[in-house]
Design a protein with these regions (language model features):
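Alpha-helical assembly-interface signal, strongest on the long, hydrophobic N-terminal helix that forms
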Residues: 2-74
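Short, conserved structural patches
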Residues: 41, 60, 64-140
Length: 140
């Protein structure tokens, strides 16, 4: 009569079959987060630069008053955003004028998430660039 001893054969295979997919999903999630975060940071930087560039176009009148509604401000902000934004970003809108009783430009944009693990979604980004008194384009 042959005695069969229980062995641990196959235990490593079962553990491998469980651990590998979980590890792969974890790393896909990390990569998805990193790519999405990089895209959002680039879009925030482009929107911030565009908002400040637009704010610098606000006119300072000879009597010291500020004329906040400049037609050039939106054009300059749009061109700065187009030059600096990542390809996944799209410009939502630009409004220049008085924001919280201060001359400024507001830039809104959207950027797509990576969509590797989680479904691809749009992330909204807003930036406001205030005019620092005494710092217009002519002063630089």
């Amino acid at each position: 009569m042959v005695t069969v001893r229980p062995t641990e054969k196959g235990q490593a295979t079962a553990l491998f079959a469980v651990v590998v997919p979980v590890t792969v999903l974890f790393f896909l999630g990390v990569i998805d987060y990193m790519i999405t975060n990089a895209r959002v940071m680039e879009t925030v930087a482009a929107a911030d630069l565009a908002a400040h560039a637009g704010a610098q176009q606000i006119n300072l009148l000879p009597d010291g008053t500020i004329e906040p509604f400049s037609s050039q401000a939106s054009v300059v902000a749009t061109s700065f955003f187009a030059a600096q934004a990542p390809p996944e970003a799209s410009l939502g809108g630009i409004s220049c004028g008085l924001i919280q009783e201060r001359p400024a430009c507001r830039v809104s944009a959207r950027v797509r998430s990576a969509g590797w693990l989680l479904p691809e979604t749009w992330i909204n980004v807003n930036a406001v660039g205030y005019l620092a008194y005494g710092v217009t384009e002519d002063d630089q």
